[in-house]
């Protein structure tokens, strides 16, 4: 099986666009267009979101449409960042549910099989997509609603929101003010976990 991370095109496109802005060399803009063409020509059903880079491609689609008059399919690329329907990593997107009594709407991670949300993926996606409202204010209401949910749910990455028996590193005493977040949040330790040696304990994890 060939390992594929198609949203690498989004990450490279963003880098090349920033280089073009900084240095003015058209070769960087041409490289950006080549990467964006790959995303533009990919069918909607073949979502590209692998883990962290696709939001930068969606951001760039909105920005280039505003700055250069291109006609990239913004909604297609934005939906890839949220809906979890991806050809090479199905389920990676934004949570839209409650886990037991906890509201996890807005967090980013594996929303289907493992049901595993990650702190840095959540923070990174917010950083990439919030700025699109500068280039297309029509997204302001939707992005604002997502950010309200995200900000509310992000507290669940921190130890003081959970009893010790739901934390993988509750014995660590180096952060008495609870300002360092856990890496991830899982619906439970067994849901979608096919690796028996790790059942019952995963590093840097809170389970609900």
Region annotations inferred by a language model:
Residues 1, 21, 25-47, 72-107, ...:
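Long, well-ordered core segments of solenoidal/helical folds
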Residues 1-3, 53-72, 94-118, 163-203:
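Carbohydrate-binding/catalytic loop surfaces
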Residues 2-3, 10-24, 55-69, 113, ...:
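Well-ordered alpha-helical scaffold segments within catalytic/enzyme domains
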Residues 8, 50-51:
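Extracytoplasmic catalytic/substrate-binding loops of multi-pass membrane glycan-assembly enzymes
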Residues 38, 49, 59, 82, ...:
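Phenylalanine-focused residue identity feature
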Residues 76-87, 104-189:
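Catalytic-core region of carbohydrate-active enzymes that cleave or remodel glycosidic bonds
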Residues 206-208:
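Conserved small/polar residues in nucleotide/adenosyl-binding loops
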